[in-house]
From Swiss-Prot:
Protein name as it appears in the record: Putative zinc finger protein ORF104b
GO BP, sorted A to Z: regulation of DNA-templated transcription
Keyword hit for Metal-binding: yes
Alphabetical UniProt keywords: Metal-binding, Zinc, Zinc-finger
ZnF region ranges: C2H2-type: 62-85
Length: 104
């Protein structure tokens, strides 16, 4: 498993119990909350009512041209196109790339 970052992990380890007690959270809820604050974990609604959540890494969101499902990674959209729409070796005409605005 890749390490997130030393700074976030150290802060998480040091402050977890204190944070969970102050905010009346369980340990797992406290971990999620700290990571959400530190890593910009987003939930992105799609036109079909599905919600995609994940860590925004480079401000890019990939949307399927056919069903408008959104993914936070290029790999995710490629797998989606192969599985759902039976498109072998998907390339850019099948993908709408949204760059920049996290509040999209």
């Amino acid at each position: 498993m890749k390490r997130i970052s030393f700074k976030v992990e150290d802060e998480l380890a040091r402050n977890l119990d204190k944070y969970s007690m102050q905010n009346h959270l369980t340990r797992s809820e406290a971990i999620r909350q700290i990571l959400r604050e530190k890593l910009s974990i987003m939930q992105i609604p799609t036109d079909k009512g599905k919600v995609v959540s994940g860590i925004i890494i480079n401000d890019e969101i990939y949307e399927c041209k056919y069903c408008h499902t959104r993914y936070l990674s290029h790999t995710g959209i490629v797998y989606h196109l192969e599985r759902e729409h039976n498109i072998k070796k998907p390339f850019s005409p099948h993908i709408i790339k949204i760059v920049g605005d996290k509040n999209e």
